[in-house]
Every structure is written in structure tokens, then in C-alpha cells.
């Protein structure tokens, strides 16, 4: 019925696009946003970013947004495969640019010195739950270096 598209992972300056596919939910949605402080002045300019990002043929599959999102997702899944091959526990089955792992604390300590990852939780006294995100700007060399470092653990 409703989903959103994040803009920054695909090169937008900021913002998210809420997409409502259920016509019944569209009624007065604009007023709800305004009443709850979610509508920015000149906010339609944010929409221009999404129009440019989503411009493409084939229902958008060839658009800049999908091209960049595909890159981010593929990089994340490449990282996930390396962690899984090393025996690391995947916390959530995510097909997106965000991957969640329970790392042994010593792995986390070593990797956190070199890589940005979100510390999420301590699922037990020997592991740290982390989130690793990729984006449109994630370089192959960075992913390969991370994989080398994981394999060296």
C-alpha cells in the first residue's frame, strides 16, 4: 500500500519519496503531512531530484535511481557473501544495501578501526551486532579490501 524510496543512497542531496499505491490512503495525505510537521517549505523541489533519478525507459529499470540502487545492493551482497563464507552469522535476510551481522567482538574491534559500521547491539557477551551499508558511491576497491580484511581474520 505504501513504501518509500531513500534518496541519499542513490545520489540525492537529501530526502525520501513516499509512494502510495492504494488510492484510499492518498485521500488527505498531504494535509496529514502538513499537520504533523513533515512538509518542508519548497519541498516540491525535493521531488525534482526524484523525477530526475527515476527518469528512464522500461518502467524505470534503466533509470539512474535503479542503476545506482542496483550497484549499492550488489556491493552489499558481495560483502554479505564474504562474511557468510567466513562463518559469520547474518542477523537479517536483507536483499538491500544494508546488511546485518553478529561479529565476534575481536573481529568488530579490528574492522571498526578501518571501516564505518553501525554498532547495533550486544546479542551476547562475545558478539557485536552491526549494520554495514553501501551506497551509489561504494567503490569496488573498498569492498575488495574489506573482503580481504575479513578473510584475514
Residue positions per predicted region:
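Hydrophobic alpha-helical segments
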Residues: 15, 20, 57, 118, ...
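Conserved C-terminal alpha-helix-loop-beta "cap" of PLP-dependent enzymes
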Residues: 77-78, 82-151
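Short, basic, helix/turn surface patches
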Residues: 1-10, 33, 117-123, 148-153
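Active-site C-terminal subdomain of aminotransferase-like
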Residues: 1-98
Amino acid at each position: 500500500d505504501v513504501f518509500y524510496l531513500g534518496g541519499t543512497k542513490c545520489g540525492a542531496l537529501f530526502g525520501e519519496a513516499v509512494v502510495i499505491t492504494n488510492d484510499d490512503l492518498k485521500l488527505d495525505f498531504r494535509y496529514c503531512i502538513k499537520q504533523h510537521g513533515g512538509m518542508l517549505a519548497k519541498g516540491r523541489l525535493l521531488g525534482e531530484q526524484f523525477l530526475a533519478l527515476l527518469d528512464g525507459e522500461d518502467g524505470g529499470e534503466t533509470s539512474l535511481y535503479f542503476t545506482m540502487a542496483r550497484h549499492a545492493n550488489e556491493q552489499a551482497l558481495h560483502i554479505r557473501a564474504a562474511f557468510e563464507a567466513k562463518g559469520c552469522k547474518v542477523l537479517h535476510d536483507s536483499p538491500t544495501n544494508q546488511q546485518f551481522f553478529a561479529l565476534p567482538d575481536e573481529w568488530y574491534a579490528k574492522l571498526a578501526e578501518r571501516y564505518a559500521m553501525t554498532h547495533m547491539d550486544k546479542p551476547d557477551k562475545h558478539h557485536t551486532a552491526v549494520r554495514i551499508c553501501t551506497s551509489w558511491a561504494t567503490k569496488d576497491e573498498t569492498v575488495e579490501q574489506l573482503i580481504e580484511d575479513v578473510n584475514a581474520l
